[in-house]
Amino acid sequence: MTKKNYNQVSMPYVDLLKSYVKERFIPFHTPGHKIGHGAPKDLRDWMSEALPYDLGVMYALDDLHEPEGAFKEAQELAADLYGAKAAWYSVNGTTALIMTMIMATVGEEESLIIPREVHKSVMSGLVMSGAKPIYLPSRFDEEWGIQLGASLEDLVSTLDAHPEAKAVLLVYPNYYGLGIDIEAMVAECHKRGLIVLVDEAHGPHLPFDDRLPVEALEAGADLVAQSTHKSLGSLTQTSTLLGQGDRIDYRRVTQVHQMLQSTSPNYIFMASLDMARQQMATEGPNLVGKAVDLAYQLRTGIQAIPGLKTMDESQLAKNFDPTKVLIDARDLGIDAVAFERRLRDHKIEVELIQACHVLVTITIGDSEASIQALLTALKEISQECLEEGRYSSPIPSLDQVNLALPEPILIKTPRQAFYVSRETIHLAEACGRICGETISYYPPGIPLISIGEEITPAVIQYMKDKQALGYVPNGAADMSLETIVVLKD
């Protein structure tokens, strides 16, 4: 079969949408604002040029669910750019795509190997599919207070212990830009006949600069979900699913994808994916290369500021993404909340605050000016803390406040647990009951207990120890943890 030659400069869906709007049809269809005429004045003033492109579903503009024309070509162009066999665009974010990957590959009572520290969409996918989770051991760096991802050795031991597993879901890279030995892991899974799914939400920029880690698709993964909007130029909640090889059922992926996407997709969102793909095809190496340069410039600048430090690949990770910059302020004598507050006073908004550090992301949207603004703010904060005498009282090391997580005991699959009635009882009475909520602490950001798991004495003691240290549970209905939600017997 002859390989199709794609014109990566083209934007077929954008061209179709623009052409349709130029026709100036009089709309007797949804949406109700009728190309902006019925929109609130504030909305018209704000989005007057965009509103004519916010159109209802119609055959003239192709169909996200069953594309045959320009949108089909747009997805084919995305697959071609990334070297995939197929691509599926999403207007429901990577959340829907992660659920799609799970539901398309594992079913009721089938086993899926996953990290403990996964996005909540994985749990949703387990509920929808009925699959049984098998957890990889969690690794946590106590100095930096972050998850490291699974090791190859842990994956091998888990595979040995669970030969019944049908698929593996890996997170690569993680929120902090930390990678895993993805190539060796994929090879090990494939050797045993398992399907490899990858949550690559934070990695759509990886193929465009040699200083960045190998992307999951090149490493051999079967299905890869990317948040195109996170590090590239499409609009928020737009994402891309990429598939390759013969281990997956493409018809089933398409069927599940149709189930989980809105039947009223926003055409502006869809067009932004086409634009972002064309931008990377024509300018990707230049744009991403510049972002990587700026990230290294920022790192060098931070290292020269008293009281601040930043993590790099020499300290922790294989396959490290330098555009994720973790800034630690413990030596300034302030925690992450105070650090973030001071940054906001300087009009700097960060991606994440956790424990004693903040995370900033450098993308194709950054510039010399934005980097200099951040460095200026950091220098001024450092000087402020020095003048306040905070340097003399640094924040304690994280290894003084982190506790070893107890091993989870799964009693019911997430799906089984989801459909059981729940009740709230006192924590003191909860030992031996099945948990009806998922509870985590930050750090380490790894679930202490999830829905369907047994509440053991070790779990209760962990809660008490964390509470004594002043930590607040995430995900608990009762933040004081005097009570806890459990499944009814």
Q: What kind of feature is each model-predicted range?
A:
Residues P306-E313, L343-I348, C431-I439:
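Short amphipathic beta-strand starts and helix->beta connectors
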Residues E351-D489:
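PLP-dependent enzyme catalytic core of the Aspartate aminotransferase-like
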